[in-house]
Curated annotation (Swiss-Prot):
GO terms for cellular component: chromatin; chromosome, centromeric region; CSL-Notch-Mastermind transcription factor complex; nuclear speck; nucleus; polytene chromosome; polytene chromosome puff. The protein has many AA homomeric domains: 21 poly-Gln runs (from 5 to 16 AA in length), 4 poly-Gly (6 to 10 AA), 3 poly-Asn (3 X 5 AA), 1 poly-Ala (10 AA) and 1 poly-Thr (5 AA) runs. May have a regulatory function possibly in association with the Notch gene product. Residues 175-192, 462-477 have a biased composition (Basic and acidic residues). The keyword Nucleus applies. This is Neurogenic protein mastermind. It holds the Pfam family MamL-1. Residues 94-111, 353-381, 402-436, 575-604, 981-1001, 1164-1177, 1362-1377, 1390-1400, 1504-1533 have a biased composition (Gly residues). Belongs to the mastermind family. Residues 987-996 are annotated as: 5 X 2 AA tandem repeats of G-V.
Length: 1594
């Protein structure tokens, strides 16, 4: 009831005031206060305060008269003490007088003082007046403070109030019902209570609370409620800060409460869950838990086991929620998890009446964070009504109470989610509510079950909204809850064992059909959600069983599918409501990667970060695995059994059963993998995959997941890193089919691939049509409409999917072997897990081979798809999935692969839901459809970046071109373009698989570049990771891009900032698109930011290099974009694109003159300009792009700076204090700087390489998306956290290396420099990357750099210049030019100018200027430190030295560019090393060295060529990595670059192998302190061990 939080927040000052108030308020009748407070809490916060004042005045008069002052004094003392302790505060509040505390603590706290004095003034004795006056004064102070805090706490407070009110009501209902249900004695009261009690319970419960508050209920309920209130607020306060770890705290109360046998076991569940959830329940997050608990309670009431199950749902949900809170962006995610658990309980319980309904309610509650907290479906009918509707209308809830959760659900479904659903998702309920529709259609019981799902969906959606929820949920769901997950399973196994068995039996019954009819029926069912309807009991049971296991994967799949996916997914990262598993969303919701993980976790949302998730997940897995075995079909894919796998298995079964993206979307996306990988991509996938990704992720996930399934642990994990995790999971879902395909693709089943492609193309075309339909409407953003569309399209989708599934199944039959055989590729695919192992290469290469092979045939598409298949599963997934996802949206590219996923459904759902519930993600409709898909593709992993890029490329292009119907068209266009791109790039792809593709198809480029990266062997590794990160980046950027595209880009960005999660996705989309644009099609506008991005992903990198270089020359554009962009390209592309502009021009132009121009534009964005130089061709489009990009850049730069300023990054750092913070901090700085760059630098970002770009871009773009990135960052970072060492290295590498991305700002060069590629390879080598952890280093270094850069800023700009992107970013053409005059000249001039200028130059300069200066300074410092630290890595050192020299030279020579000849080399070195350093600094110093060498070569070559140089330099770094980088670098010299690229690729391999050979000893000469002067660097270069000439070696 109490806001509790306010006093808690104000506890110190209010303690006294509250004590006084409490005397008065305690005098007030608690009943009145409780009732009124409940009502008031329902009212607006301010209104509540006013009402509280009036009411409290009245009550104060009454209470004062009624109560004794002595008691008041005693209570004051106690309450003061207790208030200081929120938990006690709740209890005393209950005993002392909830009203008093409520009034005092609640909004009333501040207002009460006024009221208190007023009432007392009238009725108070004179002796009391002084107290009243003091209170008045004090309260006025409090009021003022509250006025300040209200905005902050308003949401939390309202949520808390509503949730607590609902919670109180629900708790009492549940409490009573729990007694009734559990006791079964009071079962009769259940229905009456729900209906009557809803109102009566509010009154009675309030009264009872008032009475019981003094008595057991007062202790139990109040303890639960108040504590939950207190906890909730504290949770809000603490949790977000404390992060996931606090999860246990919030959980503790639940556990404590559960431990406390307040009433009966049911009460424990109810009371506990309620208390636990109650705490959460009060808050939205609490409600989620509450509802989750409601579900638990209901379920619990039904069975203790269900309690556990309920616990499970609640816990998981909470975690997700918390993760979200940690992410701050996705409260929904947590909710989602809770819902899932609740759902599971309800479903498992099989008691449709109360139990089933209850579960849903919880979900709903969570969905609403605020509103639904309670009921949303009110775990019980009561909960539903109370919680779900409670928010909207208690009356309806009352009516629906019997309906139970379902009724709420029904309302939610119909109402759009009575309280919460409507609220959070608005469409969520709608989403699930829409989903709920089936529940409505279903019998009440089924509804209850479904309702739970729907509620789950709702929860997911909602969570996004309630920030507090996240905290509270997290708390609750954080640790203990997750264990609850096993409990859920355990309970399931024990108590609900029979029910569960029944469910399993039902599943078995359905499994044959699902598995056999898996394509058609399940699809129909799932898609339509009719599936739920159609097989409501079975489906629900299956879902429930799955949910229990899968975390509602199936059920969520359903509800989640439309629902969760829909907006929630889109909206809330975790919203993957589609995830419904809650996890995906949760994880997604966990907006942070962890949140995704959480969502994933479903699995303990954040728990991802938390081990419990893994351990628990394993438990679940074991349990689920058993269940699955029991279930029969479920066992279908034992592989998955990793933490995720159980879910995946279930999902796989579900996939078989439902194959709809929904499950994938819900579970896969959210669940296991994210859970597993939250650290990695888990967050990402969820971030990406989460909502938006859902679709793509599903597609890619489907595509990827099969592989993941095959290599569930490794592959999944890797997926995790990428958006892939969720995506993978989803892909798993579809992938069972597609996996086969993809596996086959991986296996080089050209025939199958072709068939698949053909079928997929057909399907995708259908999908396109459908998506277009959906997207257009969705673009409309009408959630309901989305539902309709979903339904309408779903049938189409179903048909298509059925067809696809049938085809796929057929193919699967054909290819089923291939999944296993693919396991080899998958093993390669493991590259995700073990990117280094060429896994990407293994996968991708095979994929590439396949792609290359297919290139001829399906050519680009297949390559992408294949890459998708092969790569797709991995980061490349992007290549594949990327192709897929983008293809999914752009399905034609992705067609074959994407088709497999048919995230399209997901996309559709996502789109619809995202469109409908979309945050600001308007794209969600179209974009999110794609974004979902794309995001997921991205999520898929880096590949998804590619995907993003490609997809969004097309989408963005289309969206940009066709904002309204964009998505539909976009997919096509993009597909077409990507297609064309592929064709054009196809060759590139062939080379850089990704590259060629990428080239033409930015998306593919990136995808394939991702592949390339993967293929890049050395870079590959990094790339995988990079990609993952890229994915995040992309997502964010995509979202931005998407958002931007769809709406006013600025607005979207703002929105993005607002809906960072969505924004992140959008940004990612935007980037992806930008990348795609860079690739070309989209190049125009949107791409600006993306430019850097997308392509940036230098995925192309390694391969890119070779390819980029080789293809790069020709396909280079693609490579550039793609390869170079990709990674190498990134740099190269970035630089190459941007820098590579020159290169781009050459390569880009070569690649696709048109695309090139676009790509250049894109890349150019920076590159474009760069390109401009290159083929003037780019310029024209580039110029247009320039303006657009500049505008974009400026907007982004603005955002970035703001974000910089805002320190968006910092919060994410909070996410994982350590690594995450460092990374985030670095990312922030980088992003801030780089971010600016990323976006502005996008060119840079691209430079940064897609990796960097992706990364850097991610952050860089993120900078633009900083807001998005903030969350994303967290997510990505957390992933990097786990991956930190490996991935972090990569991450950092990406960041640091590609991260130029971060650096990207200036780092672009950095990242761009080989950042991506380097990052890729570096990643492996990067371990020094750990120094990247020092990313803090880079940060610290950067700062120092900043100082240096400050002085040398102009030069620095030049310095950034090295990062063509940098230059881009740093924008000052001079910057680029300055630095690498050589580069700068062409690149700098064109590239830089264009890059900087084009990309950033206008915007860049403004954008970067601050950022560049800061970034660069940081960079310089970083580099210095890194040099010092990474003296190992000569490259970086050299880079620094070179940079330093270069800077000095630049300063000295001024143009420095003129230094070209010798300085050119120096500059090349500098550039190279600067870029590389920047790029490599953190990323591979080795590669950087190598890259440096190569880079130098190329750069020198490029330098020779000039323009290429700049890009080349970075490119060269990329070259090494990027190979493409070479391309990029080569970009300047595409020819030499190409040769160089080839040699560089070799060199990279050799160098990377020998990278240690580069003596970094010279760095040893450098003063260790970061203050060492440039001269020191230069002097250090004099070291005999270090010869620039050594770097010159080809």
């Amino acid at each position: 009831m109490d806001a509790g939080g306010l006093p808690v927040f104000q506890s110190a000052s209010q303690a006294a005031a509250v004590a006084q108030q409490q005397q008065q308020q305690q005098q007030q009748q608690q009943q009145h206060l409780n009732l009124q407070l409940h009502q008031q809490h329902l009212g607006l916060h301010l209104q509540q305060q006013q009402q509280l004042q009036l009411q409290q005045q009245q009550h104060n008069a009454q209470a004062q008269q009624q109560q004794i002052q002595v008691q008041q004094q005693q209570q004051q003392q106690q309450q003061q003490q207790q208030q200081q302790h929120s938990p006690y505060n709740a209890n005393l509040g209950a005993t002392g007088g909830i009203a008093g505390i409520t009034g005092g603590n609640g909004a009333g706290g501040p207002t009460n003082p006024g009221a208190v004095p007023t009432a007392p003034g009238d009725t108070m004795p004179t002796k009391r007046m002084p107290v009243v006056d003091r209170l008045r004064r004090r309260m006025e102070n409090y009021r003022r403070r509250q006025t300040d805090c209200v905005p902050r706490y308003e949401q939390a407070f309202n949520t808390v109030c509503e949730q607590q009110n609902q919670e109180t009501t629900v708790l009492q209902k549940r409490f009573l019902e729990s007694k009734n249900k559990r006791a079964a004695k009071k079962t009769d009261k259940k229905l009456p209570d729900p209906s009557q009690q809803h109102q009566q319970q509010q009154h009675q419960q309030q009264q009872q609370h008032q009475q019981h508050q003094q008595h057991q209920q007062a202790q139990t309920m109040l303890a639960g409620q108040l504590q939950s209130s207190v906890h909730v607020q504290q949770k809000f306060l603490k949790r977000p800060a404390e992060d996931v770890d606090n999860g246990p705290d919030s959980f503790e109360p639940p556990h404590k409460l559960p431990n406390n046998n307040n009433n009966s076991n049911s009460n424990n569940n109810n009371g506990n869950a309620n208390a636990n959830n109650g705490g959460n329940g009060s808050n939205t997050g609490n409600n989620t838990n509450n509802n989750g608990n409601s579900t638990n309670n209901n379920g619990g009431s039904n069975n203790n086991g269900s309690e556990n199950l309920t616990k499970f749902s609640v816990e998981i949900v909470q975690q997700l929620e918390f993760t979200t809170s940690a992410a701050n962006s996705q409260p929904q995610q947590i909710s989602t998890n809770v819902t899932v658990k609740a759902l599971t309980n309800t479903s498992v319980k099989s008691e449709p009446g109360v139990g089933g309904g209850g579960g849903g309610g919880g979900g709903g509650g969570s969905g609403n964070n605020n509103n639904n907290g309670g009921g949303g479906g009110g775990g019980n009918g009561n909960n539903n009504n109370n919680g779900g509707d409670h928010h909207q209308q208690q009356h309806q809830q009352q009516q629906q109470q019997q309906g139970g959760g379902l009724g709420g659900l029904g309302n939610n479904g119909r109402g759009g989610g009575p309280g919460g659903m409507a609220t959070g998702p608005g469409g969520v309920a709608g989403g699930l509510g829409g989903m709920g529709m089936p529940p409505n259609m279903m019998s009440a019981q089924q509804k209850s079950a479904l309702g739970n799902l729907a509620n789950l969906v709702e929860c997911k959606r909602e969570p996004d909204h309630d920030f507090p929820d996240l905290g509270s949920l997290d708390k609750d769901g954080g640790g203990g809850q997750f264990p609850g997950f096993p409990d859920l399973l355990g309970d399931d196994n024990s108590e609900n064992n029979d029910t569960f068995k029944d469910l399993i039996n039902n599943l078995q019954d359905f499994n044959p059909s699902f598995l056999d009819g898996f394509d058609e029926k399940p699809l129909l069912d799932i898609k339509t959600e009719d599936g739920i309807k159609v097989e409501p009991p079975n489906a629900q049971d299956l879902i429930n069983s799955l949910n229990v296991k899968s975390e509602g994967g199936l059920g969520h799949g359903f509800g989640g599918f439309g629902l969760g996916l829909d907006n929630p997914g889109m909206k809330m990262r975790g919203g993957n409501p589609g995830n419904q598993g809650g996890f995906p969303n949760g994880p997604n919701g966990g907006t942070g990667g962890a949140p995704n993980a959480g969502g994933n976790g479903g699995n303990s949302g954040n728990l991802m970060s938390e081990h419990p998730l893994a351990a628990q997940t394993l438990k679940q897995m074991a349990e689920q695995h058993q269940h699955k075995n029991a279930m029969g079909g479920m066992g279908g894919f034992p592989r998955p059994p990793h933490g995720m796998n159980p879910q995946q298995q279930q999902q796989q079964q579900q996939q078989q059963q439902q194959q709809q993206a929904q499950q994938q979307h819900g579970q896969m996306m959210g669940q296991g993998q994210p859970g597993r990988y939250n650290d990695y991509g888990g967050g990402f996938p969820n971030d990406f995959g989460l909502g938006p990704n859902g679709p793509q992720q599903q597609q890619q996930a489907q595509q990827q997941q099969p592989q993941q399934q095959h290599l569930p642990p490794q592959f999944h994990q890797q997926k995790g890193p990428g958006p892939g995790a969720g995506m993978n999971v989803q892909q798993n879902f579809l992938d069972i089919k597609q996996e086969l395909f993809y596996s086959s693709q991986n296996d080089f089943d050209l025939k199958r691939l072709q068939q698949q492609q053909a079928m997929q193309q057909q399907q995708q075309q259908q999908h396109h049509q459908q998506q277009q339909q959906q997207q257009q409407p969705k673009m409309g953003g009408v959630p309901n409409f989305n539902k309709q569309q979903q339904q309408q399209q779903v049938p189409q989708q179903q048909l298509q999917q059925q067809q696809q599934q049938q085809q796929q199944q057929q193919q699967q039959q054909q290819q089923q072997y291939s999944p296993f055989s693919n396991q080899n590729p998958n093993a390669a695919a493991n590259f995700l897990n073990c990117p280094p192992r060429g896994g990407p290469n293994g996968n991708q290469q095979p994929g590439n081979l396949a792609q290359q092979q297919q290139q001829p045939g399906a050519g680009p598409q297949q390559q992408q798809q294949r890459g998708n298949a092969a790569n797709g599963q991995q980061n490349n997934p992007n290549a594949g999935p990327g192709g897929n996802t983008p293809n999914a949206p752009q399905q034609q590219q992705q067609q074959s692969t994407t088709t497999t996923l048919q995230m399209k459904q997901t996309q559709q759902l996502h789109i619809s839901q995202q469109g409908g519930g979309a945050h600001g993600i308007q794209v969600s409709a179209g974009q999110h459809l794609h974004l979902s898909g794309d995001m997921k593709s991205n999520v898929s992993v880096a590949a998804q970046q590619g995907v993003f890029f490609s997809q969004q490329q097309a989408q963005q292009q289309q969206q940009q071109q066709q904002p309204g119907g964009t998505n539909g068209p976009n997919p096509q266009q993009q597909q077409q373009q990507p297609h064309g791109g592929n064709a054009g790039g196809g060759v590139g792809v062939g080379v850089g698989v990704g590259v060629g593709n990428g080239g033409p198809n930015p998306g593919q480029q990136q995808q394939q570049p991702n592949q390339n990266m993967s293929n890049a062997n050395v870079p590959s590794d990094g790339f995988s990771l990079s990609q993952s990160q890229s994915m995040n980046f992309n997502q964010q950027q995509q979202q931005q891009a998407a958002a931007q595209q769809q709406q006013v880009q600025p607005n979207m960005r703002q929105r993005q900032t607002q809906a960072q999660a969505a924004a992140a996705a959008a940004a990612a989309a935007a980037q992806a698109q930008a990348a795609a644009n860079a690739s070309g099609p989209n190049v125009p506008l949107m791409q600006q930011p993306q430019v850097g991005v997308g392509v940036g992903v230098g995925v192309g990198v390694g391969v890119g290099v070779g390819n980029g270089g080789v293809v790069g020359g020709p396909g280079s554009g693609g490579p550039n974009n793609g390869a170079m962009n990709q990674m190498g390209g990134p740099m190269g592309g970035m630089p190459g694109m941007q820098m590579g502009g020159p290169m781009n021009p050459m390569q880009m132009n070569p690649n696709a003159a048109g695309p090139t121009a676009q790509q250049m534009m894109m890349g150019s964005g920076a590159g474009g300009p760069g390109q401009v130089p290159g083929p003037g061709q780019g310029p024209n489009p580039n110029q247009a792009k320039f303006l657009q990009q500049q505008q974009m850049m400026r907007a982004q730069a603005m955002q970035q700076q703001q974000q910089h300023m805002s320190g968006a990054r910092p919060p994410p750092p909070e996410y994982n204090a350590t690594k995450a913070q460092l990374m985030q901090a670095q990312m922030m700085q980088q992003t801030v700087g780089g971010g600016g760059v990323g976006v502005g630098g996008v060119g840079v970002g691209v430079g940064v390489g897609g990796v960097g770009g992706a990364n850097g871009g991610r952050f860089p773009n993120s900078a633009a998306q900083a807001a998005a990135m903030r969350r994303m960052t967290q997510q990505p970072i957390p992933p990097s956290g786990p991956m930190m060492r490996p991935q972090h290295a990569m991450y950092m590498q990406q960041h640091g290396g590609a991260g130029g991305g971060p650096r990207t700002g200036m780092g672009v060069p950095y990242g761009g420099g080989a950042g991506g590629p380097m990052g890729g390879p570096q990643q492996q080598q990067r371990p020094p990357n750990v120094q990247v952890t020092p990313d803090g280093m880079p940060m610290g270094s950067q700062q120092e750099w900043r100082h240096m850069m400050m002085t040398q800023q102009q030069t620095q700009m030049g310095f950034g210049g090295p990062g063509p992107g940098g230059p881009m970013r740093q924008g000052p053409g001079g910057f680029n030019g300055g630095n690498f005059m050589p580069n700068g000249a062409p690149n700098g001039a064109a590239g830089s100018g264009p890059n900087a200028g084009g990309m950033m130059s206008g915007p860049n300069v403004p954008q970067m200027q601050l950022t560049p200066a800061q970034m660069q300074q940081q960079l310089m410092r970083q580099q210095q430190q890194q040099q010092q630290q990474q003296q190992q890595h000569m490259g970086p050192g050299a880079a620094n030295n070179m940079q330093m020299q270069q800077l000095l030279q630049q300063q000295q020579s001024g143009g420095g560019g003129n230094m070209m000849a010798s300085q050119m080399q120096m500059t090349s070195m500098h550039m190279t090393q600067t870029q590389q350093q920047i790029t490599m600094q953190q990323q591979q110093q080795f590669v950087q060295s190598t890259t440096t060498t190569t880079h130098q070569q190329q750069q020198m070559m490029q330098m020779g060529p000039g323009g290429g140089g700049g890009g080349g330099g970075p490119g060269s770094a990329n070259n090494n990595n990027g190979g493409g980088g070479g391309g990029a670098a080569g970009g300047g010299n595409s020819a030499s670059t190409i040769a160089s690229a080839s040699s560089i690729s070799q060199t990279i391999n050799s160098v990377v192998a020998n990278s240690n050979d580069f003596g970094l000893e010279f760095l040893d000469n450098l003063p260790v302190d970061s203050n060492f002067s440039t001269q020191d660097l230069i002097n250090s270069l004099d070291n005999d061990n270090f010869n620039l000439q050594d770097f010159n070696m080809p």
